[in-house]
UniProtKB/Swiss-Prot annotation:
Signal peptide: none annotated. This is tRNA (guanine-N(1)-)-methyltransferase. GO terms for cellular component: cytosol. GO terms for molecular function: tRNA (guanine(37)-N1)-methyltransferase activity. HAMAP family: TrmD (MF_00605). Homodimer. Keywords: Cytoplasm, Methyltransferase, S-adenosyl-L-methionine, Transferase, tRNA processing. Belongs to the RNA methyltransferase TrmD family. S-adenosyl-L-methionine binds at G113, I133, G134, D135, Y136, V137, L138. It catalyses: guanosine(37) in tRNA + S-adenosyl-L-methionine = N(1)-methylguanosine(37) in tRNA + S-adenosyl-L-homocysteine + H(+).
Amino acid sequence: MWIGIISLFPEMFRAITDYGVTGRAVKNGLLSIESWSPRDFAHDRHRTVDDRPYGGGPGMLMMVQPLRDAIHAAKAAAGEGAKVIYLSPQGRKLDQAGVSELATNQKLILVCGRYEGIDERVIQTEIDEEWSIGDYVLSGGELPAMTLIDSVSRFIPGVLGHEASATEDSFADGLLDCPHYTRPEVLEEMEVPPVLLSGNHAEIRRWRLKQSLGRTWLRRPELLENLALTEEQAKLLAQFKSEHAQQQHKHDGQA
């Protein structure tokens, strides 16, 4: 997969190219990341990249000419088929379904805004899609772009050490992940659930599914509204709710 970055601070992306899963993907040739700074396309000696907004108001906007030239350079390097994405609070909110959708593209160009944003005409003429990572404001689009790159790269074949890792991630099937445990078996009198030590893979699978369903019901119930539960899932969720109610009743009795 090839990803082009338009950013005033391309050095920030060393966090992606040099470390962790994405760093290994770059090293192994599974992910290629290039960057262009609008500052390199500025024509004045001060390398100006911001300009005042028409109509007044606080803050500045990214200057049109250097930004467009940087986008055009990235498009030329990418060749045909590159999708241009602007990271913006006004965009579609990124979720696992969106990540899976974006991962089908072989080439992405990510435009990272700064200041108060970019000229609307640049969005209309140069941008294919706008994406947001949440309903809050950041200083620029670099962190959202890194979030998108990290999540999308997990779908590239060979990037993860275990083939099932991406499919078992939280949200991969619309549910939150189940609890996980490692050594020691007992930590401050808290024991690993016995089923995980049983070696019974069928029961372990059922336990994990039940915990995943239950955790989603407790923490993100709206996610369940969009799912058509199987008969097994519905039964396991009912069991979890019953067990949870019993635990709550027991806890209330001890309080």
